[in-house]
C-alpha cells in the first residue's frame, strides 16, 4: 500500500496564514524568520515519511497545529533575550526549532532519545542556518551539566512529552537557579498537577489561544527548589 501524499498547498496561502496567525498572537516576524518557518513546514512535509515525524500531512494543518501552536507560547516566555532553553522530547523539533527561529538571542538545545529524530533535527539546523540551535541525543535524566550539555537551562520546555509529574522528576536537575519548567498541555492537567513531586510547585497556568485551532491548550510553569 502506498503512503498517502500530502495535499499540495501554495506557499502564498501558508504565508498569509502565518501572517494572520502571528498578528493574532502579537508576534512580529522579519521576512527572514517568516521564510524560515515556511521552509521548516516544507521540510517537515518532505522528510516526514523518512523520519516518521508527524501524523499530520496537510501543510495547512502543520502550520496551525505545529507552528502556530508552538508560537503561542512565545509571548509568555520572551522576557529575556539571552535565555538557555532545553526542548525535551523534541521529536521533529517542536517547539524548539520554532523558538530558535523567532528568538535568535536564545541558545536552544533539542533533546530526544531517538537517533533518527536527532538526525532530522541536525539536518534542520544546517538547512535553516540556525547557529543558536544544538542537538543532544539521550534520556533527559542522563544529561549532566558540564557533560552532555554545557550548563543548566533557564527554561526547560516540552510539548506532549510525558506526564507533568514525570517530566519534572526527569528534568529538574537541569534547571538553572531562577529557571522554570514549562509544559505544553491540551486540557488542564489537574491530575498531573496533583502528582507533582515534593519540592516543585505550579508557578502559573496559562490558557493559550492558538489561532485557527478550536482546541484547548494550556501552558504550565513549574518552579523547582534549587536543593532538588
Swiss-Prot record:
GO terms for molecular function: rRNA (guanine-N7-)-methyltransferase activity. Pfam families: GidB. GO terms for cellular component: cytosol. It is found in: Cytoplasm. Specifically methylates the N7 position of guanine in position 527 of 16S rRNA. Belongs to the methyltransferase superfamily. RNA methyltransferase RsmG family. This is Ribosomal RNA small subunit methyltransferase G. It comes from Burkholderia vietnamiensis (strain G4 / LMG 22486). The lineage of its organism: Bacteria, Pseudomonadati, Pseudomonadota, Betaproteobacteria, Burkholderiales. The gene is rsmG.
Amino acid at each position: 500500500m502506498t503512503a498517502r501524499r500530502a495535499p499540495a498547498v501554495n506557499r502564498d496561502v501558508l504565508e498569509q496564514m502565518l501572517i494572520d496567525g502571528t498578528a493574532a498572537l502579537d508576534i512580529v516576524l522579519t521576512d527572514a524568520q517568516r521564510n524560515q518557518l515556511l521552509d521548516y513546514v516544507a521540510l517537515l512535509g518532505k522528510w516526514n515519511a523518512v523520519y516518521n515525524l508527524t501524523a499530520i500531512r496537510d501543510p495547512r494543518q502543520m502550520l496551525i497545529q505545529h507552528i502556530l501552536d508552538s508560537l503561542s507560547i512565545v509571548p509568555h516566555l520572551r522576557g529575556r533575550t539571552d535565555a538557555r532553553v532545553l526542548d525535551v522530547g523534541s521529536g521533529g523539533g517542536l517547539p524548539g526549532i520554532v523558538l530558535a527561529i523567532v528568538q535568535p538571542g536564545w541558545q536552544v538545545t533539542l533533546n530526544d532519545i531517538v537517533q533518527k529524530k536527532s538526525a532530522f533535527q541536525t539536518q534542520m539546523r544546517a538547512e535553516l542556518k540556525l547557529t543558536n540551535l544544538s542537538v543532544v541525543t539521550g534520556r533527559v535524566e542522563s544529561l549532566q551539566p558540564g557533560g552532555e550539555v554545557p550548563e543548566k537551562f533557564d527554561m526547560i520546555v516540552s510539548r506532549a512529552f510525558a506526564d507533568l509529574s514525570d517530566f519534572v522528576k526527569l528534568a529538574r536537575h537541569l534547571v538553572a537557579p531562577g529557571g522554570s519548567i514549562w509544559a505544553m498541555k491540551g486540557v488542564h492537567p489537574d491530575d498531573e498537577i496533583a502528582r507533582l513531586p515534593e519540592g516543585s510547585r505550579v508557578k502559573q497556568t496559562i490558557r493559550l489561544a492558538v489561532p485557527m485551532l478550536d482546541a484547548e491548550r494550556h501552558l504550565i510553569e513549574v518552579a523547582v527548589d534549587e536543593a532538588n
